[in-house]
């Protein structure tokens, strides 16, 4: 992927917003619309707006007034949403605690705690791990009138009915959706099921996972979304702070497990992206960055946007999308043959289910 000038500006605004850089940047007036659109595509509007403000304070270019007012309004909405999500995460934790059920908030609001500027990360939904296994958890939420009966539970999660908060809530009875190749998936789940017990209660009233849990679970999350349709910068920004919150010993131990779980190449690609976008120092990395694989990963980020929502045209026919995904699998082989084979099997089963 050739790094275009606007992408360099976009990266610098992210670094400014996160306090990684103090270097102001000049921005052509015609570039502002594209910068805003990319921040929206990547679900990074809050972080980039923090960067815009710092850039102006450091003597950089001011954006058009109309755009500032629009962006400022959205930034305030993001801050209020984060407060709302924290309150709901605490409520859910208390609900299950009162019934003697162990829970942990995954990703989301736990990641937001790691950001130096609070309230700038855009929340999506609440993922909560509930201990007890699928049968117990599904039965419990059904008996308490919390289950969305219109939706069948998947192998790892079920949605709750929309409550007064209106927040989308996924109850997970497995700590991760897993990996694609069966052996890798089993190793990941076995590790996470044990490590989830090392979670701690944060000052906002909900449990958050350990650094080791986050290193494995969130890399697997990025890996799976990248393999199955795309990933965005927000998830990579999250992983940057997961790494920064870990110790050297934890990173060494995590990398040994990552190799056994078939994610080594994904980790190497991600380290290059974190170096390129967030200026991450080598001492915080899991492994040596791979520029070639990193270019592929970063290219997918800008092609697909947050979670790959823009990767395929919504108007494209179902079977055409299936063909395009198979063409994409050839690219994924470089990231792991076994994982690619596993993903092809998952995708084939998905198509079969759609047809019957």
Predicted feature residues:
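Conserved NTP-donor binding/palm subdomain of two-metal-ion nucleotidyltransferases/polymerases, i.e.
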Residues: 1-124, 129-356
């Amino acid at each position: 992927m050739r790094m275009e000038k606007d992408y360099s500006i976009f990266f610098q605004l992210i670094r400014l917003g996160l306090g990684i850089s103090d270097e102001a940047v000049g921005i052509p007036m015609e570039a502002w619309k594209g910068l805003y659109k990319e921040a929206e595509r990547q679900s990074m509007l809050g972080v980039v707006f923090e960067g815009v403000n710092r850039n102006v304070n450091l003597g950089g270019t001011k954006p058009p007034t109309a755009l500032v007012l629009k962006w400022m309004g959205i930034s305030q909405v993001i801050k209020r949403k984060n407060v709302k999500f924290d309150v709901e995460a605490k409520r859910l934790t208390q609900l299950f605690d009162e019934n003697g059920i162990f829970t942990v908030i995954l990703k989301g609001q736990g990641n937001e705690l790691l950001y130096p500027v609070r309230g700038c990360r855009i929340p999506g939904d609440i993922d909560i791990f509930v201990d007890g296994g699928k049968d117990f958890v599904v039965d419990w939420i059904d008996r308490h009138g919390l289950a969305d009966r219109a939706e069948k539970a998947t192998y790892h999660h079920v949605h709750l009915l929309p409550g007064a908060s209106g927040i989308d809530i996924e109850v997970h009875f497995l700590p991760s959706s897993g990996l694609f190749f069966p052996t890798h998936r089993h190793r990941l789940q076995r590790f996470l099921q044990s490590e989830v017990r090392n979670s701690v209660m944060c000052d906002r009233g909900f449990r958050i996972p350990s650094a080791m849990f986050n290193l494995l679970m969130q890399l697997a999350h990025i890996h799976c979304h990248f393999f199955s349709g795309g990933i965005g910068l927000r998830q990579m920004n999250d992983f940057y702070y997961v790494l920064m919150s870990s110790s050297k010993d934890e990173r060494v131990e995590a990398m040994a497990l990552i190799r056994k779980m078939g994610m080594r190449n994904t980790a190497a690609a991600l380290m290059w992206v974190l170096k390129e976008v967030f200026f991450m120092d080598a001492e915080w990395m899991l492994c040596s960055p791979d520029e070639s694989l990193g270019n592929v990963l970063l290219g997918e980020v800008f092609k697909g946007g947050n979670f790959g929502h823009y990767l395929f045209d919504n108007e494209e026919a179902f079977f055409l999308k299936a063909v395009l995904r198979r063409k994409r699998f050839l690219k994924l082989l470089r990231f792991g043959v076994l994982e690619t084979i596993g993903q092809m099997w998952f995708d084939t089963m998905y198509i079969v289910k759609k047809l019957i």
